[in-house]
Amino acid sequence: ISNLPYYAATFFLRTFLELEHKPELMVLMFQKEVAENVLATPGSMRLLSVITQMLCYSEKICDVPKESFEPAPKIDSSIVKLVPKQDSFITPINYVPFCDLLRAGFSSPRKTISNCLSNSLHKPKSECNSMLLNCGIDPQRRAETLELAEWELLFDNSYEELFSLE
């Protein structure tokens, strides 16, 4: 159980997520906006929400208004419960490559997933379109709209091709 310093909360969370032997349960207080990012659903997903939700079951316990503290900070907080998944497809071996795919997909939030992958990975757009379509993903969608299962499918079916050196 922790009240993380807000300026370092994302760093600490990513560090916990990278551990091979994670705590059985994490109850953390975040700045409310960070908690919303961690708990986001398709349509507003971010890199942090995808990787957190791939590795942990997550739920908001409650919001904590700024007036609950003395002196009152400028922001509201939220308490989030994270329980590491035992059955996540992400392992210590594929954690970094999966994050590479997410970074490429979320590299330009206003662009389509196809454009992001093509630009970030220096691959022809037609190749990225083909890989996305083979996974049942419309290349015109944005990364924030993809479901967790779609990210997993894209990684499983396309990672070697996307990141191969030519």
Residue ranges and their predicted role:
Residues E150:
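Ca2+-coordinating acidic residues in Ca2+-binding motifs
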Residues I1, A8-A143, L153-E166:
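Class I S-adenosyl-L-methionine
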